[in-house]
Curated annotation (Swiss-Prot):
The protein's name in its UniProt record: Phosphoribosylformylglycinamidine cyclo-ligase
Keywords: ATP-binding, Cytoplasm, Ligase, Nucleotide-binding, Purine biosynthesis
Principal location: cytoplasm
Any single biological process term in GO: 'de novo' IMP biosynthetic process
Length: 346
């Protein structure tokens, strides 16, 4: 072999192992702040260990995985990365609470073409904040530097969460019946859904993201992190007979509410029971979006819809509002004919 040939390294190929190690050192404090007593060991191992909480008699594991979609593009364009991790945690843990699950631990996957330690640390710090809000431990993750797969320093994130629920307390919608009340729990904005349409609206309307709407810029409204409902929802579940919970995500009202309704029932939603947050009216006007399409794409100000006996609705609303949520009675469950749509907005 010729001596004058250059010796190549992994770094020459675009993968900086030292940068990855530096990132791990930066985020150790974040991970420590999320720790739960069930977690065994620290980060850096091949796998993470977590015991089941001893308070459960027949524990059932609940799992979920999600991303934040094209809201990431907005974060990249705004160079604002400190809250996208909250979105990531929220999209996973809010799916767990639908079945009554208490989140136990969370793992993240961060992939990029070229690792920017500062940006990645901001993202993971946001993930840690989301885990604190949800009461779960950030126990591990993967940072993948993949030159040629992503443009420049663009990145993508995915999250994985595991929770636990008592077997006899699983919420699965089978108890939903005509006459149940429907409670809405307000959202913080578009959350992490509908951003491909949002970006199209911004493009065709040539919108100014620095424009102010109700004292905040359009950019601030759109990048607002997804609300995490875990602590207030767990308290509600503990004190009330919850029949179903729907997380209003991609597909809006039309797609998500029927997922928790048994055959022969429908949700009758009072469209006059709340005012859409201003950002949704702005999006509808700028994009000339039909109202049906708005309800099919966005949460329109509603993050969760809860079904429960009507005699418990008033107390549940009061509990949620005392916990800092914005909750109200949004409608009821009614009998549905065969083939009838399961969501009716009046």
């Amino acid at each position: 072999m010729s001596d004058n040939k250059t010796s190549l390294s992994y770094k020459d190929a675009g993968v900086d192992i030292d940068a990855g190690n530096a990132l791990v050192d930066r985020i150790k404090g974040v991970v420590k702040r999320t720790r739960r007593p069930e977690v065994m060991g620290g980060i850096g191992g091949f796998g993470a260990l977590c015991e089941l909480p001893t308070k459960y008699k027949q524990p059932v594991l609940v799992s979920g995985t999600d991303g934040v979609g094209t809201k990431l593009r907005l974060a990249l364009d705004l160079n604002k990365h400190d809250t996208i991790g909250i979105d990531l945690v929220a999209m996973c843990v809010n799916d767990l609470i639908v079945q009554g699950g208490e989140p136990l631990f969370f793992l993240d996957y961060y992939a990029t073409g070229k690792l920017d330690i500062d940006v990645a640390a901001q993202v993971v710090t946001g993930i840690g904040e989301g885990c604190i809000q949800a009461g779960c431990a950030l126990i591990g993750g993967e940072t993948a530097e993949m030159p040629g797969m992503y443009e420049g320093e663009d990145y993508d994130v995915a999250g994985f969460c595991v929770g636990v629920v008592e077997k006899e307390d699983i919420i699965n919608g089978t108890k939903v019946a005509a006459g149940d009340a429907l409670i809405a729990v307000g959202s913080s904005g578009p959350h992490s859904n509908g951003y491909s349409l949002i970006r199209k609206i911004l493009e065709v309307s040539n919108a100014d993201l620095t424009e102010e709407l109700n004292g905040r810029t359009i950019a601030d409204h759109l990048i607002e992190p997804t609300k995490i409902y875990i602590k207030s929802a767990l308290k509600m579940i503990a004190e009330h007979d919850i029949h179903a919970i729907s997380h209003i995500t991609g597909g809006g009202f039309w797609e998500n509410i029927p997922r928790v309704l048994p055959e022969g029932t429908k949700a009758v939603v009072d469209g006059k029971s709340w005012e859409w947050p201003a950002i949704f009216n702005w999006l509808q006007e700028k994009g000339n979006v039909d109202t049906y399409e708005m309800y099919r794409t966005f949460n329109c100000g509603v993050g969760l819809i809860v079904a429960l006996p009507k005699e418990q609705a008033e107390q549940a609303v009061a509990l949620l509002n005392a916990e800092g949520e914005n909750a109200w009675v949004i409608g009821k469950v009614a009998a549905a004919e065969q083939g009838e749509e399961q969501v009716e907005i009046r």
